[in-house]
Amino acid sequence: HHAIHRLLPIAGSYQQALLDDVAQAYTVYAPEEAESIFNRGNQAIEDIKGHVSGIRYNACKMREANRKVSELEDMHAKAVMYHNSVKPYMDTLRFHIDQLKHILHVA
């Protein structure tokens, strides 16, 4: 939770800065350089958007699965269901968090 709550606002700010850079590229740079900045900026914006969506979706699904697991009484059944139901969302969530950290250059 902590990583998500810290990372998403940073992603939003970074995405806004990229949008500003892309919008200003053609007024500041030569056409060829502006196009390159525009293309790189748009790709980064799309990548950020995809990873933020992946984080939100998988965090929600993981919470839902975790609620179902916590209702079980039997510890073995809990462990099996956690492994089968919660962990896959956790792994995908970790992937999106790591990718977003890489894009944002955040440790």
Task: Give short role names for the model-derived ranges.
Residues 1-107:
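C-terminal amphipathic alpha-helical interaction region
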